[in-house]
């Protein structure tokens, strides 16, 4: 389609240039007269040499027009075409780069979301682990304190029991000494023993 348009344009330019040059040459003749439609052909081609002259003038004019107008115009159009193609290519490259950057940005955003979620999950897991360790440590310490308290209570209890037994033995020895020294009768001995037992039971009750 483009080649056909160029060909039509060239032939149109050729015909227009030929008739323009012919009219110019006819108008420059010595006997200037009005050009009529019936005498145009005779004026243009009165003989063979005039025809050759017209043809040479036409080719000269065509050559000048090609070199002075057509080729510079073609160069300008080609340069313009190349510039537009370069701009389109650059725009496509920029669009491609923009799409790549957008895709990379989306990928980095998704990775950042994944990493942040992993960090939050890890922090929650570590917090739960720390809470569990603190609870276990607190339970161990509480159990240890309870055990130590029970040990202390049991130790105090044994100590009080041993002290009570020791005091009971000492009281019994004192009572025996008093019985021996006083040498009282059997009834007095019975009363003294009953009193000693009551005192011993009272001491044990106070210890408990």
Curated annotation (Swiss-Prot):
Lipidation, S-diacylglycerol cysteine type: 28
Keywords: ATP synthesis, Cell membrane, CF(0), Hydrogen ion transport, Ion transport, Lipoprotein, Membrane, Palmitate, Signal, Transmembrane, Transmembrane helix, Transport
Residue spans crossing the bilayer: 49-69
Cysteine disulfide links: none
Lipidated residues (N-palmitoyl cysteine): 28
InterPro entries: ATP_synth_B-like_membr_sf (IPR028987), ATP_synth_b/b'su_bac/chlpt (IPR002146), ATP_synth_F0_bsu_bac (IPR005864), ATP_synthase_B_chain (IPR050059)
Source organism, top-level taxon: Bacteria
Subcellular location: Cell membrane
Cellular component, GO, one term: plasma membrane
Signal peptide: 1-27
Topological relation to the membrane, as annotated: Single-pass membrane protein
GO molecular function, one term: proton-transporting ATP synthase activity, rotational mechanism
Assembly information from the UniProt record: F-type ATPases have 2 components, F(1) - the catalytic core - and F(0) - the membrane proton channel. F(1) has five subunits: alpha(3), beta(3), gamma(1), delta(1), epsilon(1). F(0) has three main subunits: a(1), b(2) and c(10-14). The alpha and beta chains form an alternating ring which encloses part of the gamma chain. F(1) is attached to F(0) by a central stalk formed by the gamma and epsilon chains, while a peripheral stalk is formed by the delta and b chains.
Family: Belongs to the ATPase B chain family.
Function recorded in the entry: F(1)F(0) ATP synthase produces ATP from ADP in the presence of a proton or sodium gradient. F-type ATPases consist of two structural domains, F(1) containing the extramembraneous catalytic core and F(0) containing the membrane proton channel, linked together by a central stalk and a peripheral stalk. During catalysis, ATP synthesis in the catalytic domain of F(1) is coupled via a rotary mechanism of the central stalk subunits to proton translocation.
PANTHER family per the UniProt record, alphabetical: ATP SYNTHASE SUBUNIT B, ATP SYNTHASE SUBUNIT B', CHLOROPLASTIC
HAMAP family named among the record's database cross-references: ATP_synth_b_bprime (MF_01398)
Name of this chain's protein: ATP synthase subunit b
Naturally occurring in which organism (per UniProt): Mycoplasma genitalium (strain ATCC 33530 / DSM 19775 / NCTC 10195 / G37) (Mycoplasmoides genitalium)
